A protein has these predicted regions:
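N-terminal FAD cofactor-binding segment of flavoenzymes
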Residues: 44-81
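Conserved FAD-binding catalytic core of PHBH/FMO-like flavoproteins
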Residues: 60, 170-281, 286-288
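N-terminal Rossmann-like FAD-binding beta1-loop-alpha1 element of flavoenzymes
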Residues: 4-31
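FAD/FMN-dependent oxidoreductases across multiple families
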Residues: 144, 153, 257-349
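Glycine-rich FAD pyrophosphate-binding loop
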Residues: 23-45
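Conserved N-terminal helical subregion
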Residues: 3, 74-156, 162-195, 203-208
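C-terminal helical "tail/cap" subdomain of flavin- and related membrane-associated enzymes
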Residues: 336-414
């Protein structure tokens, strides 16, 4: 049996950031991941992007991963413009008076993951357990090999058991791992959450999200834009190139499915109209993808020997791609709790030492879920009175400098 201090299930952005945060702890850590990154290419754009707020980019810099991101492709944005179609409702945010150069950065998820993977792979205290397509190959690669400076083993988790003193993982190849703490960073359909019998509250948003990349006739001027309509939300997130954007279009499933399969020319027309011609003619530049939107909230974020972070604990509506910031804050707080309790010489895997993390992050996730649901409900429906109230409310807020400043500071994570 292999013995570790922490075993992380899931090598996505949140799980890898959590591992990187423990780099100076001296703890032994294993990461179990079935789909390692294949390398990042500047030749093409990956479909999913995130809007990293200031707190997230600063933390990635502390972890030593931001340099790897910035050297590749990152798009800072310094303004955000939100409006409602066929209404006078609008609000605009910028960096004025904040003392920061930008509101955040638009970064492709695969680039964030690749940079974190390379950062974690350089650390000798981590062992990466991977399922490979070809065989049960085991090989060691020195840290001088920047391609794959990790140990590769074929592995997927098969069962999870918990005792008072440790958690026991059995892998599909028969290996057994022991850990003080197992961290579920394995996404919305978390295997860890299911194994731990943690109940899940969820709500179907009744929408699907369509994502793709487009070229716009007019430059985006490093402004993130979002338009609400009676049946959906459309966000344009600026890329580094001045006429390229990633879009996230939240729509009823039947509309999303139509837009997924319609002719490119038809898609371009409908997208341009839906965006109120704000950036002129929009032209599709990538494959289109859709995914169902569901809000999820785990009843427990922690229990004895088990903790959940990121989408394993909660998922929110992908308004403007902000969800990853919530997951990074989970990872940061859990890492801080582990490091603090390790210094005190206590068993950080016991539930009593995980309760502070759980209480704090459950509150923050619940607040974000309520805000996202509130925005969706606020802009749903096109009754004239409701549109008037929305218009008056947004326009009034747009003129309240102090209120806007507090709202944007909250979004920045300050």
């Amino acid at each position: 049996m292999k013995i570790f201090d922490v075993v992380i299930i899931g090598g996505g952005m949140t799980g890898l950031a959590f591992a990187a945060a423990l780099q100076s702890s001296g703890l032994s850590i294993a990461i179990i991941e079935s789909n390692p990154p294949k390398g990042f290419s500047l030749e093409q754009f990956s479909p999913r992007v995130s809007a990293l707020n200031l707190a997230s980019s600063q933390w990635l810099e502390e972890l030593g991963a931001w340099q790897g991101i910035a050297q590749q492709r990152v798009a800072p944005y310094d303004a955000m413009y939100v409006w409602e179609r066929d209404s006078f409702a609008k609000i605009e945010f910028n960096t004025q008076g904040l003392g920061v150069p930008q509101l955040g950065h638009i970064v492709e998820n695969e680039l964030i993951r690749q940079a974190l993977w390379e950062r974690v792979a350089q650390q000798k205290t981590h062992e990466i357990l991977l399922r490979t397509e070809s065989s049960s190959l085991v090989r060691s690669v020195s840290n001088a090999d920047v391609q794959n400076p990790v140990d590769f083993l074929t592995a997927l988790p098969r069962s999870l058991g918990v005792t008072d003193r440790n958690a026991i993982l059995t892998l599909e190849d028969g290996q057994m791992l022991s850990a003080k703490l197992v961290v579920g960073a394995d996404g919305a359909n978390s295997w860890v959450r299911k194994q731990a019998d943690i109940p899940l509250t969820f709500r179907d948003y009744g929408h699907s999200a369509l994502v793709c990349h487009v070229q716009t006739e007019q430059p985006h001027t490093h402004c993130a834009r979002q338009v609400f309509s009676s049946d959906g939300v459309l966000a344009f997130l600026p890329f580094a190139q001045e006429n390229y954007c990633s879009i996230v279009w939240s729509l009823p499933p039947e509309q999303a499915d139509y837009l997924l399969h319609c002719e490119t020319s038809e898609f371009n027309k409908k997208l341009t109209v839906a965006f109120d011609h704000k950036l002129g003619l929009c032209q599709l530049q990538s494959k289109r993808y859709t995914f169902k939107l569901t809000a999820r909230y785990a009843r427990n974020f922690a229990q004895n020997r088990i903790a959940l972070i990121g989408d394993a604990a909660h998922t929110i509506h992908p308004l403007a791609g902000l969800g990853v910031n919530l997951g990074f804050q989970d990872a940061k707080m859990l890492a801080q709790a582990i490091l603090a309790n390790e210094q005190l010489g206590v068993d950080f895997g016991e539930y009593r030492y995980l309760r502070h993390y759980e209480r704090n992050r459950k509150v923050e996730a619940a607040k974000m879920l309520l805000v996202m649901q509130g925005l969706k409900d606020l802009f749903s429906g096109d009754h004239p009175l409701k549109k008037l109230i929305r218009g008056l409310g947004l326009s009034a807020t747009d003129k309240m400098g102090l209120v806007k400043e507090q709202l944007i500071k909250q979004a920045l994570g300050l």
